[in-house]
C-alpha cells in the first residue's frame, strides 16, 4: 500500500482517510522500509498534508500508543516545533502556571528535535525524573494535577519512523502528529504551529479527533506560540464550532518585545530561565509565559475574560504557587525507584 501511496502523493494526489490509515499502520507496525518511509514523508511534505490525511495518521498514532486514563478533563500545551526561533521552553514553563491554577495538565513531549532543548531536556535539567511508567505518571497527575509523558515511553511504534525522521532533519507530518497524539487523551489543547497555513486545518483535525476545547496558534513572527513580538493568528475550537481571530499583545496589556529577548539555549540555560520566571523575575520572558498561560486558563474556565486570566496567571507566579507546583513535581517524580528504559 505504501508504494502505491508514494506514487499517488508524488503526483500531487491526496490520499483518502482509509488509504492513509493503511499506510500509517504499515509504518507503525514495521512493515515499511526506511526508504519507503523517507520517500512518503518527503512526498507528503512537498504536496502538503490534507485534513483527512492528518486526521488519519493521528488516529493511528492514538490507537497504537500506551494510554493513561485521567479522572478529569486534562489540557496539553504544546508546539509543533520547527519554528527555528530557539526560544526558551515557553509551553513547558506555562504548564506549571496553568496546573497551579487548578487545570490538570498532561504534558506530552520528548527531547530536542529541531531546537537546542526539548521539553524532556528542560524537565530533567530542573531535577524532574522523566523515566516513569504510564501508571506512575497517572498517579502524579491525580495527586498534583500535572504530569509529563515522555513520548518514547508511550509511542513504541514510533521506533520505525524515528531514525528516518532524524536523518531527514526537516519538518515532516510527524512534527504535526506528536502534539495530536497525547496519551492522556487531552481534550483541551493550546497547540502552536510553525506555519500559519496549518492553523485552521489543525483546528479542524482536533475537531475531528473529538477535542472539547482548543486554540491553534501561530505568531506572525513565526513562533509556534502566542507571541509578544507581533500579532498571533488563533483558531478556537469550542462546542463543535471553529472561530478564527487575531490577538495582539496590546489587547491584553502587554508591551511588544524583540524576538531575541525570548531566546533560550541549552537545557542548563533554559532551566535557569524557567527558575527566574517562577521566582518572580519580570520582563518579556515572564510576560510570554503569562500570555500563553492565560489562554489555557481561559479555555478551562467559563464566564471569565482573557484579561482576568492574565491577572490569574500573574498571581499564580507572584504567590509562589507555580514554583510550588514545580517543587511538588520534582519530589513526586523522584519518589519512584522504578525506571523505564
Swiss-Prot record:
Top enzyme class of this protein? transferase
**Residues reported in the UniProt entry to bind Mg(2+) 2:** 224-225
**Superkingdom of origin:** Bacteria
Say which species the protein is native to. Answer: Ruminiclostridium cellulolyticum (strain ATCC 35319 / DSM 5812 / JCM 6584 / H10) (Clostridium cellulolyticum)
Positions binding anthranilate 1 in this chain are 79
Its function? Catalyzes the transfer of the phosphoribosyl group of 5-phosphorylribose-1-pyrophosphate (PRPP) to anthranilate to yield N-(5'-phosphoribosyl)-anthranilate (PRA).
Cofactor dependence is on:
Mg(2+)
GO terms in the biological process aspect are: L-tryptophan biosynthetic process
Associated pathway? Amino-acid biosynthesis; L-tryptophan biosynthesis; L-tryptophan from chorismate: step 2/5
Q: Which GO terms describe its cellular component?
A: cytosol
Query: Assembly and partners?
Result: Homodimer.
Question: What is this protein called in UniProt?
Answer: Anthranilate phosphoribosyltransferase
Residue positions binding 5-phospho-alpha-D-ribose 1-diphosphate: 79, 82-83, 87, 89-92, 107-115, 119
Q: Which molecular function terms from Gene Ontology are attached?
A: anthranilate phosphoribosyltransferase activity; magnesium ion binding
Q: Which residues bind Mg(2+) 1?
A: 91, 225
Which InterPro entries does the entry link to? Anthranilate_Pribosyl_Tfrase (IPR005940), Glycosyl_Trfase_fam3 (IPR000312), Glycosyl_Trfase_fam3_N_dom (IPR017459), Glycosyl_Trfase_fam3_N_dom_sf (IPR036320), Nuc_phospho_transferase (IPR035902)
- What keywords are annotated for this sequence in UniProt? Amino-acid biosynthesis, Aromatic amino acid biosynthesis, Glycosyltransferase, Magnesium, Metal-binding, Transferase, Tryptophan biosynthesis
Taxonomic lineage per UniProt? Bacteria, Bacillati, Bacillota, Clostridia, Eubacteriales
Family matches, as PANTHER family: ANTHRANILATE PHOSPHORIBOSYLTRANSFERASE
Signal peptide location in the record?
Answer: none
Amino acid at each position: 500500500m505504501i508504494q502505491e501511496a508514494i506514487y499517488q502523493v508524488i503526483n500531487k494526489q491526496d490520499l483518502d482517510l482509509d488509504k492513509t490509515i493503511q499506510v500509517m499502520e504499515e509504518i507503525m507496525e514495521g512493515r515499511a522500509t526506511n526508504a519507503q518511509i523517507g520517500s512518503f514523508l518527503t512526498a507528503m511534505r512537498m504536496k502538503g498534508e490534507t485534513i483527512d490525511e492528518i486526521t488519519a495518521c493521528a488516529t493511528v498514532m492514538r490507537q497504537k500508543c500506551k494510554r493513561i486514563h485521567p479522572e478529569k478533563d486534562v489540557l496539553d500545551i504544546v508546539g509543533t516545533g520547527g519554528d527555528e526561533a530557539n526560544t526558551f521552553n515557553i509551553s513547558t514553563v506555562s504548564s506549571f502556571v496553568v496546573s497551579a491554577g487548578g487545570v490538570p495538565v498532561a504534558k506530552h513531549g520528548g527531547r530536542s528535535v529541531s531546537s537546542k532543548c526539548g521539553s524532556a531536556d528542560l524537565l530533567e535539567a530542573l531535577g524532574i525524573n522523566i523515566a516513569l511508567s504510564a501508571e506512575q505518571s497517572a498517579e502524579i497527575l491525580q495527586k498534583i494535577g500535572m504530569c509529563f509523558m515522555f513520548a518514547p515511553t508511550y509511542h513504541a511504534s514510533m521506533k520505525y519512523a524515528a531514525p528516518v525522521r532524524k536523518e531527514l532533519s526537516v519538518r515532516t507530518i510527524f512534527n504535526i502528529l506528536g502534539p495530536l497524539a497525547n496519551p492522556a487523551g487531552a481534550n483541551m489543547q493550546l497547540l502552536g504551529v510553525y506555519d500559519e497555513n496549518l492553523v485552521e486545518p489543525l483546528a479542524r483535525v482536533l475537531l475531528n479527533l473529538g477535542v472539547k476545547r482548543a486554540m491553534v496558534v501561530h505568531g506572525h513572527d513565526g513562533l509556534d506560540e502566542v507571541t509578544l513580538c507581533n500579532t498571533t493568528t488563533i483558531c478556537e475550537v469550542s462546542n463543535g464550532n471553529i472561530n478564527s481571530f487575531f490577538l495582539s499583545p496590546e489587547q491584553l496589556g502587554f508591551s511588544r518585545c524583540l524576538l531575541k529577548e525570548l531566546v533560550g539555549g541549552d537545557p542548563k540555560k533554559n532551566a535557569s530561565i524557567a527558575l527566574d520566571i517562577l521566582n518572580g523575575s519580570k520582563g518579556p520572558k515572564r510576560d510570554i509565559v503569562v500570555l500563553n498561560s492565560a489562554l489555557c486558563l481561559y479555555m478551562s474556565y467559563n464566564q471569565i475574560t482573557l484579561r482576568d486570566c492574565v491577572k490569574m496567571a500573574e498571581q499564580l507566579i507572584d504567590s509562589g504557587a507555580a514554583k510550588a507546583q514545580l517543587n511538588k513535581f520534582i519530589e513526586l517524580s523522584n519518589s519512584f525507584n522504578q525506571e523505564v528504559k
